[in-house]
Each structure stands twice: as structure tokens, then as C-alpha cells.
Amino acid sequence: ESFEGISVSKKIDKLGYRGLETVEMSYVDHRVPHGNVLGGEEGIGHGRRYALSALELGRINVASRSVGVAQAAFEAAMRYAQQRHTFGRPIFEHQAIQFKLAEMATKLQAARLMTYDAARRADAGERVDMEAGMAKLFASEAAFEIATDALRIHGGNGYTTEYPVER
């Protein structure tokens, strides 16, 4: 549907989120009919609050996906550490690998709990801008660190398509 004063000028190609189109939009002399105002008549003047509320849920979504990525990387590292042998035993039995896996599991659990807490509070109708932002920050950084450590546990094999951690 087109509205006077709104134009779509450019589709933006992205590295991820390919299932959701992103476009560049311009608003020139655009007026929103009262029937299209978010929240109906009562929503007039509250657009900023509604937009910020959507950002909170988006941050929880990013945190949730980050926890999923971290979980997959951790599980791949755990499987590999149990299957790969050096010096006649699984690398899982080497203390350095155990320490690394324990650190990964701790970061993963902390990210999961922060994300659950933000989601639970949002579901209860609470304002969660701080909690959602903290969960997004911590979970996304944890996912990067856990994926990096999973690659290190795999060694050179982590860079081959033979193992899922390469993704």
C-alpha cells in the first residue's frame, strides 16, 4: 500500500537477516491518518514510547538468538573435545580444555538467565529497556567469545566445512 509523502528509494543488501527486506525510506510532507496511528486515537503523541518499547523486544530477540548461537557452538566444542584424541586420550580430559569448556558454559548460562529475566519481565508488562539492553550486550559478546573458543578447541578443523562450528 502506498501513502502520499512516503517513498522507497533503495533496497539494502545485508550480510544476515535475508528473510526480512530492508529498504531506505523517505518521508516528505507525510501525514498519518488518525485511523492509522499506532494505539488509535489514544496513541497520538505516544509514538516515541511505542517505538522504544519495540526496541526492547528487539533487543530481547537478539539476545535470544545470541544464546542459540552460543549453545550450538558450545555443544559442537563439547562433542569434538570428547571425540578428538591426543596423547592417547580425548582432549576433553586435558585440564586446559576443561577450563575453557567450563568458562564457555558459565558465559552461556549467564547470557541465558539474563535473557530469560528480560523476557519474563517484558511478558509481565514491565519496562525492560535496561534489562533488554544488558541481555543483548552480554549475550552477543558471549556468543562471539564462545564461538571463538569453540573454533580454538577444534583447532584447524574448525575452519573446515566438515564441522558445524565453521558456520
Please annotate each region the language model reported.
Residues 52-53, 146, 154-167:
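Glycine-rich phosphate/cofactor-binding loops in nucleotide/flavin-utilizing enzymes
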Residues 142, 146-149:
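Amphipathic alpha-helical coiled-coil segments
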Residues 93, 97, 132-137, 158-167:
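Charge-rich, acidic-biased intrinsically disordered regions
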Residues 62-72, 103-107, 138-141:
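Amphipathic, heptad-repeat-like alpha-helical segments
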Residues 1-75, 79, 89:
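FAD-binding core of flavoproteins
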Residues 78-92, 105-138, 151-154:
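C-terminal helix-coil-helix/basic helical segment that borders enzyme active sites and/or dimer interfaces
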